[in-house]
Amino acid sequence: MKGKIFISFICALIFLVVTCAFLSHSAKEDKTKGHETAIQAAKEHGFASIDEVNTFYNRNVYYIIQGKNKKGEKIIGWMKKGNTDKILIKKAKEGLSKDDVLQLIQNIDNSKPKKIKKIMLGYDDTDSKKWDIPVWEVQYIDQQNRYTYFIVSFTDDRVYKMYSIKQ
């Protein structure tokens, strides 16, 4: 009797491990799906090397490609999923750096960060023409313990918006 219980336990444990491994692999694959297509398109649009590719979710899905052009200058590309013919490319020095954005949010009086969760390049494609632009998105916990999204234009630190949600 103890042998049957032990074998059943081992089988259940193996099933659980295999299921967890499958779910983990599937989730990771969804996160990086499309990166190879983005890399290929970026190379066709002037990227000599690729340092990083990230997926950004807004109204649409965007691939953010960071690398260098043939002159060795750091460049960033924003490509909408499924649109490999059109990539918005800017030199990194034309916009705000990650450090610039971190400094900017430290100066916000009513919503200073207590803990930064994530900072990443993205693309805001909301219905307003003002917001059809490359952006930096910062997710953080503010001093009032709210989960806050701070979205600022990649090229103009005066253009930003902020949302706070109670945890």
Report residues per predicted region.
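Short amphipathic alpha-helical segments, especially helix-boundary/capping motifs
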Residues: 12-17, 39-41, 76-81
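Short, non-transmembrane alpha-helical segments in secretory-pathway proteins
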Residues: 22-53, 89-130
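Conserved histidines in hydrophobic membrane contexts and catalytic metal-binding motifs
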Residues: 61-67, 72-79, 100-163
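Extracytoplasmic/periplasmic/luminal assembly and interaction segments
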Residues: 51-96
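Short, solvent-exposed secondary-structure boundary motifs
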Residues: 44-46, 55-57, 140-144
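Hydrophobic membrane-insertion alpha-helices, especially the h-region
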Residues: 4-23
